[in-house]
């Protein structure tokens, strides 16, 4: 298995380009938090979640701002993390199908493991052996020697992995004991499968759950296992007896997260019902409701700085992470004020968290405006914002306003083809460009708010401009005057202008913008920040990864062709004119109605009375004046109609077809002379 090694898949697989519109520093979790790890030696908490970012926080309560740093390299949800090597190394598993190895103290990614073929959902760690296991939706379990992973370098970048086979369904949970002698997996198969990681031998299959197994814990010696399931139960298994020895019905809904004390006598559980219980494994009737969260619980992490544990950290589908005290739990038990019937409401031990790591808002709704450049979004705090896809930035925070009203307010009778797609999975705007439609949208420079140095109004391709901006730091895209002598360069505007500057000559995207090259279907090939494409390593990886359709526009400057639209032009029934032979015409879909009116005036109406309207003085007029005269006369004398609706001369053909024609077949336009 090659770590950080990418084969040149760009030529064989369909590759898309994505980028994320965001702030340079995303200080707060922007979505649900899937994973937690506590480093008691440094008083640090690692959170990893659905916004793709791993963050490091100080758990020192005296610090006003707990944020320390972000660890960014993943491109999709981070589903699990484990701290290894006494807190020096962090391993992460993600829905981008990779496992990453991080320097936890310095916060940088050391290597990437690409063995999995689908979402990686769970990790397990054997502390005494420095062994990590990873598993996911591809039904595979891989074993990794952490010391080997941390020794990987650019020249020594291969690592051997063992795999455990036999799972028939997607794996959602994984556990390994500290000694590294037992590994257990839980899946949608509803069974627990058990192996010996030393020999990769299958040991047993444990049946009992009736739904997905979402959480697993193993006793240090590997003799007992705890499982939490979407069926709402917690089960205690004896691996020696190969059977379930106790079932705990504590929760009203699915159990998604478990923690256990070092003595393996008390289990802490949370899940869909938002409640966190502590249950005595020896006396199942004794369970204490510790607290109730505001959202379903995804992960918990015990503070093991003392015995019994003084606190528990809790992550949910919301972005805030809470620390709840456990200090009164023994008095609570001793008083007998515990729940022995989970159907009866009881008072939780804690009503307020001891410490809060505040989260940020997640974008949950978006609307692409008609200009196919701007987007309106609404977040979990009901704040509405206005974004520019082309410049990859937020234009304005609109606050708590009515989302639908803002959409109506910004509606324009203009049609631009779709040229990108939007994904909100991480809680931020991720824009994806695909070869099939990236170059579909042409607009005039004037309509896009750009001015040309020569005062002209060239046609611009939005997808082409954006790709040039995203890769403007990549030296391969830079053109020098010497290159221009050898190659005739077509600018994105279609002009033959000298292009010595980087980018597209109109705008730049923020240099911190993450750019992602990935296979259609989600597998990431390469992620980098826009500004880093000038680096030697990054430039080399771009050479291997950037697909030909992007090379064509950014390196070779080959512009896509204009979109053509076929249409028919006929006299209106009210004009009394003879119907013409039905010729099928074709023009750029951006052609304005006024240009068709000029064509009608000059080539059709004027032909009948050309001898009367042409004079010697007119013949002597400069060509430009003639054109201006025709434009004015056409607008004064001609009307163009579609579906019996008089058309605005400023409208273009694609807008007419989309908003007025609205039917299959070729567009049909009718003309008539205005009544005087």
Swiss-Prot record:
A Pfam family annotated for this UniProt entry: WD40
Major subcellular location class: nucleus
Sorted UniProt keywords: Acetylation, Cytoplasm, DNA damage, DNA repair, DNA-binding, Endosome, Lysosome, Nucleus, Phosphoprotein, Repeat, Ubl conjugation pathway, WD repeat
Residue positions, PTM Phosphotyrosine: 28
Annotated stretches, region: Disordered: 607-628
Gene this chain is encoded by: Wdr48
Free-text function comment from the UniProt entry: Regulator of deubiquitinating complexes, which acts as a strong activator of USP1, USP12 and USP46. Enhances the USP1-mediated deubiquitination of FANCD2; USP1 being almost inactive by itself. Activates deubiquitination by increasing the catalytic turnover without increasing the affinity of deubiquitinating enzymes for the substrate. Also activates deubiquitinating activity of complexes containing USP12. Docks at the distal end of the USP12 fingers domain and induces a cascade of structural changes leading to the activation of the enzyme.
Gene Ontology terms: cellular component: late endosome; lysosome; nucleus
Residues annotated with N6-acetyllysine modification: 214, 578
Protein name: WD repeat-containing protein 48
GO molecular function annotations of the record: deubiquitinase activator activity; DNA binding; double-stranded DNA binding; single-stranded DNA binding
């Amino acid at each position: 298995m090659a770590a950080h090694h990418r084969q040149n898949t760009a030529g064989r697989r369909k590759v898309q380009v994505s980028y994320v519109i965001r702030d340079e520093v995303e200080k707060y979790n922007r979505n649900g938090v899937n994973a937690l790890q506590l480093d008691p030696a440094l008083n640090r908490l690692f959170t990893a979640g659905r916004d793709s970012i791993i963050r490091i926080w100080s758990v020192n309560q005296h610090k006003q701002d707990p944020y320390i740093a972000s660890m960014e390299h993943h491109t999709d949800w981070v589903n699990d993390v484990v701290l290894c090597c006494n807190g020096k190394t962090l391993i992460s598993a993600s829905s981008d199908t990779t496992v990453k190895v991080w320097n936890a103290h310095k916060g940088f990614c050391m290597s990437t493991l690409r063995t999995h073929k689908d979402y990686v959902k769970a990790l397990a760690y054997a502390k005494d052996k420095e062994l990590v296991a990873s598993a996911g939706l591809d039904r595979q379990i891989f074993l990794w020697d952490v010391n080997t992973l941390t020794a990987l370098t650019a020249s020594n970048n291969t690592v051997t992995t063992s795999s455990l086979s036999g799972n028939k369904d997607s794996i959602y949970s994984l556990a390994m004991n500290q000694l590294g002698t037992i590994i257990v997996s839980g899946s949608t198969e509803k069974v627990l499968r058990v192996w010996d990681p030393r020999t990769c031998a299958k040991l047993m299959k444990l049946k009992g759950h009736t739904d997905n197994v979402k959480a697993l814990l193993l006793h240090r010696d590997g003799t007992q296992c705890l499982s939490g399931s979407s069926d709402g139960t917690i089960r205690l298994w004896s691996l020696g007896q190969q059977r379930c020895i106790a079932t705990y019905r504590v929760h009203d809904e699915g159990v998604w997260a478990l923690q256990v004390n070092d003595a393996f006598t008390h289990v802490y559980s949370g899940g869909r019902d938002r409640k966190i219980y502590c249950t005595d494994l020896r006396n199942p009737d004794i369970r204490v409701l510790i607290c109730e969260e505001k959202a379903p619980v995804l992960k918990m992490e015990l503070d093991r700085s003392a015995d019994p544990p003084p606190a528990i950290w809790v992550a949910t589908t919301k972005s805030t992470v809470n620390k709840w005290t456990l200090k009164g739990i023994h008095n609570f038990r001793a008083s007998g004020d515990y729940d022995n019937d989970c159907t009866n409401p009881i008072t939780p031990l804690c009503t307020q968290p001891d410490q809060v790591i505040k989260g940020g808002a997640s974008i949950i709704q978006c609307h692409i405006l008609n200009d196919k450049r701007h987007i309106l979004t609404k977040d979990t705090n009901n704040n509405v914002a206005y974004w520019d896809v082309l410049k990859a930035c937020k234009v304005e925070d609109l606050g708590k306003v009515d989302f639908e009203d803002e959409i109506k307010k910004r509606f324009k009778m203009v049609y631009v083809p779709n040229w990108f797609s939007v994904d909100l999975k991480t809680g931020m705007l991720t824009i994806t460009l695909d070869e099939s439609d990236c170059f579909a949208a042409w607009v005039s420079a004037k309509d896009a708010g750009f001015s040309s140095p020569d005062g002209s109004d060239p046609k611009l391709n939005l997808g082409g401009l954006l790709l040039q901006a995203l890769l403007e730091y990549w030296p391969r895209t830079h053109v020098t005057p010497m290159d221009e002598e050898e190659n005739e360069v077509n600018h994105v505007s279609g002009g033959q202008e000298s292009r010595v500057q980087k980018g597209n000559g109109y705008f730049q995207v923020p240099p911190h913008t993450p750019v992602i090259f990935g296979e259609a279907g989600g597998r990431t090939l390469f992620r980098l920040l826009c500004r880093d494409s000038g680096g030697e390593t990054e430039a080399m990886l771009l050479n291997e990864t950037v697909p030909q359709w992007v090379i064509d526009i950014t390196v070779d400057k080959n512009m896509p062709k204009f979109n053509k639209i076929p249409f028919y032009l006929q006299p209106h029934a009210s004009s009394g004119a003879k119907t013409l032979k039905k010729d099928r015409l074709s023009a750029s879909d951006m052609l304005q109605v006024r240009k068709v009116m000029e064509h009608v005036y000059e080539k059709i109406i004027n032909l009948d009375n050309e001898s009367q309207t042409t004079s010697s003085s007119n013949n002597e007029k400069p060509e430009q004046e003639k054109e201006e005269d025709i434009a004015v006369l056409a607008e004064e004398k001609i009307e163009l109609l579609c579906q019996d609706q008089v058309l605005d001369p400023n409208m273009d053909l694609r807008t007419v077809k989309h908003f007025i024609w609205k039917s299959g077949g070729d567009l049909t336009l009718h003309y008539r002379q205005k009544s005087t």
